[in-house]
């Protein structure tokens, strides 16, 4: 069975940024406006604009980048992608029709002293490789969305005096974006108050997330067992895989939710065994093709709290129980989840506190009216114009 199943701030501008903006976005002319337009139309040949997108490592960086890349392509842009060989971005990006530009660079966190000592040489080599890509492509704009590959690419963009736009998806900034934000032409964030002088626009996402019916329309007239969607992400979530089947087994079969459980390809067989051992039926899938529709169809989503997941749930307006990944850098998944939880738009359960019996009791006490209230509050926090705003900035800077 197959499941059917984000304070606005002025853009970053210092004195030098204003000067750059004047050069890039056009200064006052002594010619009448119509004369300038006529001369431009006749003297400038049509030129295909080029963007270089930089994002890698995890889906949380890559999927917002793909949303931007697809929107730029729809506007006639040629889009190239800077990434690393053998990475998730190399698997996901080329099949979508974008040219992949590989450079050799990876993270150093948690990889030992030897890797850390080799960092200066590796970084210098990656910057040279990225600079060669920028020189060859001569992009009109360079867009960084995080991941280690963004840092050498961002340095190369600024050395070549190309406009550099950054987008930070998480509520706690990553190292590459934190360092590059001082050099960037524009800085955007998915959550408020993340970086100085940044514009809070939300997270770039596909239109499907912003076009779902409002919660009160979706849930009107629903009866019967609750519909529970468990989302483990592309790599799966072992804690959810272990605990959810046990929790469901505590619930009498006639009161048990209808469950769709997504886990990564590498964990799907172990997940099947967990459900079989618990004697619980569920729809199990390694991947959800239409996540927006899945969120809309569910009464409740049980999930991690990656930036994309949190902002997409807000965009759809869905009730969710967030179980942050406890080993996320700077515990950013907890602060991501708190964005919705603090306004009553969901629940936050730390993984250390998640038990089968506790989850079973929580699920048994949930009523659709309460879930509707949570979904409505989550939707009040959505910011859905990030893709539009960043693409518009690209087009202004490319003139």
From Swiss-Prot:
Positions of region (Disordered): 1-30
Top class in the EC scheme: transferase
GO cellular component: plasma membrane
Keywords tagged on the record: Cell cycle, Cell division, Cell inner membrane, Cell membrane, Cell shape, Cell wall biogenesis/degradation, Glycosyltransferase, Membrane, Peptidoglycan synthesis, Transferase
Gene Ontology BP term (one): peptidoglycan biosynthetic process
Cited SUPFAM superfamilies: UDP-Glycosyltransferase/glycogen phosphorylase
This enzyme's EC code(s): 2.4.1.227
MF term (GO), any: undecaprenyldiphospho-muramoylpentapeptide beta-N-acetylglucosaminyltransferase activity
One Pfam family matching this protein: Glyco_tran_28_C
Function summary: Cell wall formation. Catalyzes the transfer of a GlcNAc subunit on undecaprenyl-pyrophosphoryl-MurNAc-pentapeptide (lipid intermediate I) to form undecaprenyl-pyrophosphoryl-MurNAc-(pentapeptide)GlcNAc (lipid intermediate II).
Protein name per UniProt: UDP-N-acetylglucosamine--N-acetylmuramyl-(pentapeptide) pyrophosphoryl-undecaprenol N-acetylglucosamine transferase
Encoding gene (name): murG
């Amino acid at each position: 069975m197959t499941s059917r199943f984000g304070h606005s701030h002025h853009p970053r501008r210092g004195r030098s940024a204003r000067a750059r903006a004047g050069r890039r976005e056009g200064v006052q002319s002594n010619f009448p406006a119509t004369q300038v337009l006529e001369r431009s139309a006749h003297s400038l040949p049509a030129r295909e604009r080029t963007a270089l997108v930089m994002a890698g490592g995890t889906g949380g960086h890559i999927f917002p980048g793909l949303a931007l890349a697809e929107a730029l392509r729809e506007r006639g842009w040629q889009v190239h992608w800077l990434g690393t060989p053998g990475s998730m971005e190399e698997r996901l990006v080329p099949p979508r029709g974008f040219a992949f530009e590989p450079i050799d660079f990876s993270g150093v966190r948690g990889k030992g002293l030897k890797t850390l000592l080799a960092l200066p040489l590796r970084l210098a080599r990656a910057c040279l490789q990225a600079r060669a890509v920028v020189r060859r492509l001569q992009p009109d704009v360079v867009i960084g969305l995080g991941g280690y590959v963004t840092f050498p690419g961002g340095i190369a963009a600024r050395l070549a005096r190309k406009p550099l736009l950054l987008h930070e998806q998480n509520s706690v900034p990553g190292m590459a974006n934190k360092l590059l934000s001082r050099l960037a032409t524009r800085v955007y964030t998915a959550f408020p108050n993340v970086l100085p002088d940044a514009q809070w626009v939300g997270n770039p996402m596909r239109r499907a997330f912003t076009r779902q019916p409002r919660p009160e329309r979706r849930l009107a007239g629903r009866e019967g067992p609750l519909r529970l969607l468990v989302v483990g992400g592309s790599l799966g979530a072992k804690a959810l895989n272990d605990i959810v089947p046990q929790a469901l087994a505590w619930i009498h079969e006639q009161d048990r939710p209808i469950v769709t459980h997504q886990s990564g390809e590498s964990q799907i067989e172990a997940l099947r065994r967990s459900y079989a051992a618990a004697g619980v039926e569920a729809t199990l899938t390694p991947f959800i093709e239409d996540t927006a529709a899945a969120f809309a169809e569910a009464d409740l989503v049980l999930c991690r709290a990656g930036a994309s997941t949190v902002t997409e749930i807000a965009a759809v307006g869905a009730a969710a129980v967030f179980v942050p990944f406890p080993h996320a850098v700077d515990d950013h998944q907890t602060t991501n989840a708190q964005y919705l939880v603090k306004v009553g738009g969901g629940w936050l359960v730390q993984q250390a506190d998640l038990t089968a019996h506790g989850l079973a009791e929580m699920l048994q006490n949930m009523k659709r009216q309460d879930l509707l209230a949570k979904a409505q509050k989550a939707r009040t926090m959505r910011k859905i114009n990030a893709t539009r705003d960043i693409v518009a900035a690209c087009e202004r800077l490319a003139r």
